[in-house]
């Protein structure tokens, strides 16, 4: 249902080279270089204010980089329909009068062009996306009637309707109960099978280790990037979190004294 465009899958879906972003004279991101391939699932972890949200906004084209390059299949991200940015729920006005189906249809806007009404094909994409995330019965609901997990799944449906091949999800699991988190993680499993590449910002190191192919440990710079066993080593975590790192219950389980607040305020305009 989600046919991808004729991209060359031999090249990285996302290639970031020496990316920096300055805000009020300070580096929110400094000399970030990495690449992702098709169907990879990557967790981005780091302390509050580390630049996770800023990274997603620059990669998706919401913010322009101060220096460096971002390429999606060899093209700049601005206006690229293959990339979907899913913001933190705290950044959304949930009282805006719009229903679930109309939000998902917004994913088709780049395909429609200006002053072009949706056609049957567009509604087919919307309905299939809603079925995929199990929200078909709530299509006519106002968005403020949804639970937190349903709101998050609605945004994933919008990205599916967009036919996105790269999804950047900013703290999608934050504030959700365990069943809602498991539903999102199950959706990520399905996206991987459909060759969708996903980057997820999260504070949960255990979830990052158990559910993602690679982990990026970020604190304005990339501290480490690779498989979970290599990245989540004590020396790397101490470099990223410093004194906020502690051992849980005297065991060799490292946790972070970091408040999972609803907004990582490194740069949220």
What are these regions (language model features)?
Residues 142-146, 150:
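Conserved ABC ATPase signature
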Residues 120-138:
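Conserved ABC ATPase "signature" region
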Residues 60:
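Helix-to-loop junction immediately C-terminal to a conserved catalytic motif
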Residues 233-235, 239-269:
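ABC ATPase nucleotide-binding domains
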Residues 167-171:
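Catalytic Walker B motif of ABC-type/P-loop ATPase nucleotide-binding domains
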Residues 68-83:
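Conserved ABC transporter NBD signature motif
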Residues 216, 220-230:
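Conserved switch/coupling elements of ABC/ABC-like ATPase nucleotide-binding domains
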């Amino acid at each position: 249902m989600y046919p991808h465009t004729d991209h060359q899958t031999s090249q990285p879906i996302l290639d970031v080279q020496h990316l920096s972003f300055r805000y009020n004279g300070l580096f929110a991101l400094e000399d970030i270089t990495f690449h992702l391939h098709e169907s990879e699932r990557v967790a981005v972890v780091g302390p509050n204010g580390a630049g996770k949200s800023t990274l997603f906004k620059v990669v998706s084209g919401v913010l322009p980089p101060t220096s460096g390059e971002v390429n999606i299949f060899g093209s700049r991200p601005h206006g690229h329909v293959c990339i979907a940015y899913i913001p933190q729920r705290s950044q959304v006005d949930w009282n805006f009068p719009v229903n679930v189906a109309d939000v998902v249809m917004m994913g088709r806007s780049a395909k429609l062009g200006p002053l072009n009404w949706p056609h049957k094909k567009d509604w087919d994409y919307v309905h299939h996306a809603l079925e995929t995330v199990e929200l078909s019965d709530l299509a006519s609901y106002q968005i403020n009637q949804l639970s937190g997990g349903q709101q998050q799944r609605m945004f994933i449906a919008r990205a599916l309707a967009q036919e996105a091949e790269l999804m950047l999800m900013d703290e999608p699991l934050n504030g959700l109960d365990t069943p809602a988190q498991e539903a999102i993680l199950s959706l990520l499993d399905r996206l991987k099978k459909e060759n969708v590449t996903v980057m997820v910002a999260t504070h949960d190191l255990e979830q990052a280790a158990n559910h993602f192919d690679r982990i990026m440990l970020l604190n304005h710079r990339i501290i480490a990037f690779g498989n979970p066993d290599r990245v989540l080593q004590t020396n790397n975590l101490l470099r990223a979190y410093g004194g906020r790192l502690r051992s849980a219950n005297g065991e060799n389980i490292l946790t972070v004294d970091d408040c999972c607040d609803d907004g990582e305020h490194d740069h949220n305009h």
